[in-house]
Structures are given as C-alpha cells and as structure tokens.
C-alpha cells in the first residue's frame, strides 16, 4: 500500500483500532447536515484516524451520499479551520502537490515553502508528488519550477524535484573524503565558487552519506559546512543548501524552526503551520515537538494555544497530540 511511504514511527496520529468507514461516514454526514455543524465530532473523527483510513471514509461518503466530503466540508466550514480539515482528508502526495502549486501561483514565489517541501521529502515521496502534480494540473512540476525560479536556485530545486537523492543507509568513507575535498575546492579554496558541485553533492547524496561528508569537510577546512555556505553563496540558493544541511543533521529540528517562524511575531503563518502539522502528523511530529521545546523554551502545544483560537485551535492541538 502506497501510504506506507508517508508513515513513520514518530507520528502523533496512528491507525484507529476498530475502524469502520461506514460508521464514520455516517457520523460525519450527521455532523455536517444537522442544524448547525457539529464541529467536535468532525474534529474527533478526522484527527483520530490515519490518512489511509480517512481516504476510505472519503470513498465511503461518496458512495453512500453521492456527494464529495471535500465539497461538503468546504460548504460548511470556513477560514483556517476549513483549510486544515480539508488538508486532513487529502492524500499526502496530493496535499504536497497543492502546496507546491500554491507557493508558485500568482504574483511572486514563496521560495521558503518550495525549499521546505523539497528538502524534507524523500526521493520516493517526490516521485509520487510529481505524479500527483501532473494529475491535478496537467503540467509538470519541473516546468512550473523552471518558469518560476532561476539560476543555481532553479538547478538545485529541479535536482531535488527529480527525486534522485540516494536513499540507501550505506555510507562510503572514501566517497565522503572525496566529496568533502570537492566541496572545499569548489568554494573555500578558490576564487569564486563552483555552485554546480555544491548542488550535485548536497542534492544527490544520502543524508547519512552527507553527515559523514560534513565531518570530513570540517577536518579539511577547519570550518563547518554551514559557515562555508554562508560565506560562499547567497540568496535563495544559499537558503536551500543551508536547509539541506540542517535536514541532513536533524530534519525535526529544521521543521521545528519553520513552525517557530510561523508562530512568532505579530501574525501567524497558517499556511506553513497547517502544512507541517498535517504532513508530519504520521511521520515525526513527536520529534518535532521535542526539538521545539528544546530550542524555543516552550512546548509547541502552548505556542499553538496562545497563537490560534476557536475550532482551528482545537484541531491543531488534537493533531499536536499533547503538551510537553
């Protein structure tokens, strides 16, 4: 079953035992179609079922009522609450495809979102996302990235979008030494920087392999790779490579940083908040919570609590799954 690509050991949401899609579909129908919406029932059912189970509810709902659950939720709910509830019933690859489309639509491109999605998804996930993107928009993800970005940033994004990163857990010490030297020769050691070498190594090697490479890099250059990237590169390309380094070292910490960014300051970036909470809820949200507490001195739960309100707050806290 394809869903296993999207499930990890450290999620806050798991399969619901004794799951019965027709019972759930009926309860949801009642919650939507009664006088006034019973938000509590909707929240409880959708946050206590895995995405694979929600897909079965969507199917059952369509068969029983000849009505799309998504359309009914959209018709009945509104605002950020509606967005997160619709996200919950969307298959993961389709959800990511939509988020990528949204980040490239209209005036200006949301580079941070492109970087976040493309650096945190596995190669196999990227292949599914590209398929979902084509199915939804009849356009290649590659082509849209190409027309919305440029230069070395574009090249690196396309390399990631192709899903060519090695996924094996084997590490090759000789290759790590060689790559570390290549990075050093391409940056610190020469006048000007050979950006292609950075893209090739950072966007194609496996995370375990890169970890070893970064250790070797420090031995050769007496510098941390992050400092070299900051010194040698600039703009969105620099941001992307720094994100790769941070994900290599600790993906949950990188995503905790993104959540902190989304929650701090005057406004809340609900687009990012919804995306990370929903997309990591069955993968590593427990680890993200731990990193959030460690780095920012308060729990993710309390940060969400103080920054959101109403049913929107309730559903996010349910996904969060507990206070730390």
Swiss-Prot record:
It holds the Pfam family Annexin. GO terms for molecular function: calcium ion binding; calcium-dependent phospholipid binding; calcium-dependent protein binding; phosphatidylserine binding; phospholipase A2 inhibitor activity. Annexin repeats lie at residues 19-90, 91-162, 174-246, 250-321. The modification Phosphothreonine is found at residue 268. GO terms for cellular component: axon; cytoplasm; dendrite; membrane; neuronal cell body; nucleus; phagocytic vesicle membrane; plasma membrane. Keywords: Acetylation, Annexin, Calcium, Calcium/phospholipid-binding, Phospholipase A2 inhibitor, Phosphoprotein, Repeat. Transmembrane segments: none annotated. The keyword Electron transport does not apply. GO terms for biological process: animal organ regeneration; defense response to bacterium; hippocampus development; neutrophil degranulation; phagocytosis; positive regulation of angiogenesis; positive regulation of DNA metabolic process; positive regulation of endothelial cell migration. The keyword Transmembrane helix does not apply. The modification N6-acetyllysine is found at residue 178. Coiled coil: none annotated. PROSITE patterns: ANNEXIN_1 (PS00223), ANNEXIN_2 (PS51897). Belongs to the annexin family. Inhibitor of phospholipase A2, also possesses anti-coagulant properties. A pair of annexin repeats may form one binding site for calcium and phospholipid. This is Annexin A3. It comes from Rattus norvegicus (Rat). The gene is Anxa3.
């Amino acid at each position: 079953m394809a869903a296993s690509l999207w499930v990890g050991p450290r999620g806050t949401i798991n399969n619901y035992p004794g799951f019965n899609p027709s019972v759930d579909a009926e309860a949801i129908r009642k919650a939507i179609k009664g006088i006034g919406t019973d938000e509590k029932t909707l929240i409880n059912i959708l946050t206590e079922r895995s995405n694979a189970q929600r897909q079965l509810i969507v199917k059952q709902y369509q068969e029983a009522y000849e009505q799309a659950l998504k359309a009914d939720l959209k018709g009945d709910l509104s605002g950020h609450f509606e967005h997160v509830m619709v996200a919950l019933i969307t298959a993961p690859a389709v959800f990511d495809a939509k988020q990528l489309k949204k980040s490239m639509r209209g005036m200006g491109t949301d580079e941070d979102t492109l970087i976040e999605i493309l650096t945190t998804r596995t190669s196999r996930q990227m292949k599914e996302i590209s398929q979902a993107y084509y199915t939804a928009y009849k356009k290649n993800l590659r082509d849209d990235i190409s027309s919305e970005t440029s230069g070395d940033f574009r090249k690196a994004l396309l390399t990631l979008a192709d899903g060519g990163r090695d996924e094996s857990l084997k590490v090759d010490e000789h290759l790590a030494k060689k790559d570390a030297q290549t990075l050093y020769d391409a940056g610190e050691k020469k006048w000007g920087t050979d950006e292609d070498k950075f893209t090739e190594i950072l966007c194609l090697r496996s995370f375990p392999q890169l970890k070893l490479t970064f250790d070797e890099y420090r031995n050769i250059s007496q510098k941390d790779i992050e400092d070299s990237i900051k010194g040698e590169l600039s703009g969105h390309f620099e941001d992307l490579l720094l994100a790769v380094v941070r994900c290599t070292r600790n993906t949950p910490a990188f995503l905790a940083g993104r959540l902190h960014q989304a929650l701090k300051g005057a406004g809340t970036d609900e687009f990012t908040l919804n995306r990370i909470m929903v997309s990591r809820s069955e993968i590593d949200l427990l680890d993200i919570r731990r990193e959030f507490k460690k780095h920012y001195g308060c729990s993710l739960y309390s940060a969400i609590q103080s920054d959101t309100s109403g049913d929107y707050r309730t559903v996010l806290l349910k996904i969060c799954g507990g206070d730390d």
